[in-house]
Amino acid sequence: MANGKTTLGLVVGNRGFFPDHLVESGRKQVLEVLEKAGIKVVCLSTSDTKLGAVETREEAEKCGRLFREHTDEIQGVLVTLPNFGDERAVAQTMRVSKLDVPVLVHAFPDEKGKMGLVDRRDSFCGKMSACNCLTQYGIRYSLTDSHTVDPGSDEFLAELEQFAAVSRVVSGLRGATIGAIGTRPPAFDTVRCSEKILEASGISLEPVDLSEILFAVHALKDDDDRVKARVDAVKAYFAVCDAPIEAVTKIAKL
């Protein structure tokens, strides 16, 4: 996904008695995937905290403050657990950040033959603990389809693309003003909506009389450069086939 418009905050979990090298390599791998996906990342550096991860309360608060400084940029937060992770640090990071954005919790899978003290992740259980703690803190989150996912897999990239898209939609709709053209046709109850519910989500509805739109359309000339450019865009978007040019032009003006 080549999309540089998405900015995600990254929280890397760690837990002291689990192998640190898994956090070091896991953080690097996730950052590489995010870069490949064209996603801008806001995260702690390895000079900010141990391994650039969060484990202690102090590290969580440092990460939370960093996110708060980038509130206007961050559209979503990815929590990744290369090892078990510290659930309190993950939740505390989100609490301090005061962000109200989509959160995706990801866990690394363990590998057969690497279940000893040196290489065991136990992220499977760590994810359940982190999610439980987030729930206690009242922080909403979403999960990957598979409980654990290899960051190098196509499955993870697909999860990332979907989450980035959701984050962009949420970010775009908050504070948006939607134009409602004309009144609702009496026979179509399916298009009813509540302005109060929309406003509660930060979305304003601005009614526009249909006559105003039609007046503006009639004022446009067929040879207007803006109209011709839109006609070309309509033709490029779908096959107009035998549609009359007049109809295509009217669509372009609208």
Give the role of each language-model region.
Residues 1-171, 175-254:
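Metallocofactor- and cofactor-centric catalytic cores in central/energy metabolism, strongly enriched
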